[in-house]
Amino acid sequence: ASYKVKLITPEGAVEFDCPDDVYILDQAEEMGHDLPYSCRAGSCSSCAGKVTAGNVDQSDGNFLDDDQMADGFVLTCVAYPQSDVTIETHKEEELTA
């Protein structure tokens, strides 16, 4: 399956289709969008975003705790879309505040 991913970035919103077996960060880059990242392994907060609609599977990550995930935070480098999803990017400062 493939889902519509909408990213709300500081530069504005971008939308693209993302297969459910491709990480959102990888697909965004494939489509020419620059997003912050560091480890690419779900072990830091550089790529953190916030899901405002839809669902993701980020079970490959280990940095976020249950409360942070419940608040909507997502690591885009290990997030697969599970539905059409909207994510606010560049949320590392908010996450670590």
UniProtKB/Swiss-Prot annotation:
<feature type="binding site">
    <location>
        <position position="77"/>
    </location>
    <ligand>
        <name>[2Fe-2S] cluster</name>
    </ligand>
</feature>
<dbReference type="GO" id="GO:0009570">
    <property type="term" value="C:chloroplast stroma"/>
</dbReference>
<dbReference type="InterPro" id="IPR006058">
    <property type="entry name" value="2Fe2S_fd_BS"/>
</dbReference>
<dbReference type="GO" id="GO:0006124">
    <property type="term" value="P:ferredoxin metabolic process"/>
</dbReference>
<keyword id="KW-0150">Chloroplast</keyword>
<dbReference type="GO" id="GO:0009507">
    <property type="term" value="C:chloroplast"/>
</dbReference>
<keyword id="KW-0813">Transport</keyword>
<dbReference type="GO" id="GO:0008198">
    <property type="term" value="F:ferrous iron binding"/>
</dbReference>
<feature type="binding site">
    <location>
        <position position="47"/>
    </location>
    <ligand>
        <name>[2Fe-2S] cluster</name>
    </ligand>
</feature>
<dbReference type="GO" id="GO:0051537">
    <property type="term" value="F:2 iron, 2 sulfur cluster binding"/>
</dbReference>
<dbReference type="InterPro" id="IPR001041">
    <property type="entry name" value="2Fe-2S_ferredoxin-type"/>
</dbReference>
<comment type="similarity">
    <text>Belongs to the 2Fe2S plant-type ferredoxin family.</text>
</comment>
<keyword id="KW-0411">Iron-sulfur</keyword>
<dbReference type="InterPro" id="IPR036010">
    <property type="entry name" value="2Fe-2S_ferredoxin-like_sf"/>
</dbReference>
<dbReference type="GO" id="GO:0022900">
    <property type="term" value="P:electron transport chain"/>
</dbReference>
<feature type="domain" description="2Fe-2S ferredoxin-type">
    <location>
        <begin position="3"/>
        <end position="93"/>
    </location>
</feature>
<feature type="binding site">
    <location>
        <position position="44"/>
    </location>
    <ligand>
        <name>[2Fe-2S] cluster</name>
    </ligand>
</feature>
<dbReference type="InterPro" id="IPR010241">
    <property type="entry name" value="Fd_pln"/>
</dbReference>
<keyword id="KW-0001">2Fe-2S</keyword>
<keyword id="KW-0934">Plastid</keyword>
<keyword id="KW-0479">Metal-binding</keyword>
<dbReference type="InterPro" id="IPR012675">
    <property type="entry name" value="Beta-grasp_dom_sf"/>
</dbReference>
<dbReference type="GO" id="GO:0009055">
    <property type="term" value="F:electron transfer activity"/>
</dbReference>
<keyword id="KW-0408">Iron</keyword>
<keyword id="KW-0249">Electron transport</keyword>
<protein>
    <recommendedName>
        <fullName>Ferredoxin</fullName>
    </recommendedName>
</protein>
<dbReference type="Pfam" id="PF00111">
    <property type="entry name" value="Fer2"/>
</dbReference>
<feature type="binding site">
    <location>
        <position position="39"/>
    </location>
    <ligand>
        <name>[2Fe-2S] cluster</name>
    </ligand>
</feature>
<comment type="function">
    <text>Ferredoxins are iron-sulfur proteins that transfer electrons in a wide variety of metabolic reactions.</text>
</comment>
